[in-house]
Amino acid sequence: MLTVVQSFFIVCIFSSSFTLVLSSNGDRTSFFNNCLRNCERQNCSADGLEIQEQAVKYYQQTVFDKLMQWTCSDECQYGCMWRTVEAFQDRNWQIPQFYGKWPFVRFLGLQEPASVLFSLFNLLAHVRNLRKFRREVRPDSPCYKIWHLFSAVAINAWIWSIVFHARDNPLTELLDYSFAYSMVLMTLYCMVMRMLHKYSWLLKAFISLAFLSYFINYFVYITVGRFSYSLNMTTNLVTGALSALGWFLWSFRVRKQRPYYRKILGFYLLLGMSMSLELLDFPPIFWILDAHALWHLSTTFIMNPLYSFAIDDCRLLRTEKYYESVGYDKEI
């Protein structure tokens, strides 16, 4: 438990300074900005979208670049970014960041290819685990629909993670951050619904509506206002910590009756350790693989104990439900 809590607070402290890197040392340099202005003036249309005819031979976009809608201004920014990186390296300075991000080599038009690939791995991991859940758990089991809802929310979140890392713009960023939080919020919702699975449908419907209303309100807030990275990070951490705390307390209470409680503890311990990757901040290896991409890779594997827990729990809840129906009202 200490590992998870410590990781939450360490990342929370780290996030408090996150907004300071929105403008980074690379894009603040006069070298980069002069390069960008000259490039756009010489090569781009007035709106910055089209590459002028005389510059086409210098900016030969692939079909993937065009598919991802890389504009002339984007190409200038990309080229000037690498010229600035070379200038820093020639002076033996540290690799700079640009607009809060490390420089990445584009591949097939993808802005952060490793994060795209690992986000896809996460999506497939949820699909695979959901199929396993459906094979091993009967539809009439308690909490069956809740875990389906969790999978749907998670799959949607990873779809937008793929989109965002493929092409970073204000819209894809908003959707990625929003739906990533929906997945964190969903873990808290699943915990609450699991604790209340024997209560009336009216109470559960009211709580479900409260969760939905809260998420919609949060989405509207970060959409119409100025997006705050520190607020988003803190909100994720607090929500995740509440979920982890709830499961830890539940595990302590049922540790003798439900030996599979270790799986949910294992999930949160692994999650807490994986979050430490977000604290590592180094230039991308081969200009592709950075700490954030490694974090996405790590989360691919830690979903297995969570789904395994859900399978064991739903099956045992169904058995208990059967015994209750025949008059044996006792938890196994």
Residue ranges and their predicted role:
Residues 19-332:
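Multi-pass alpha-helical transmembrane bundles in non-GPCR membrane proteins
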Residues 2-5, 10-29:
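N-terminal signal peptide
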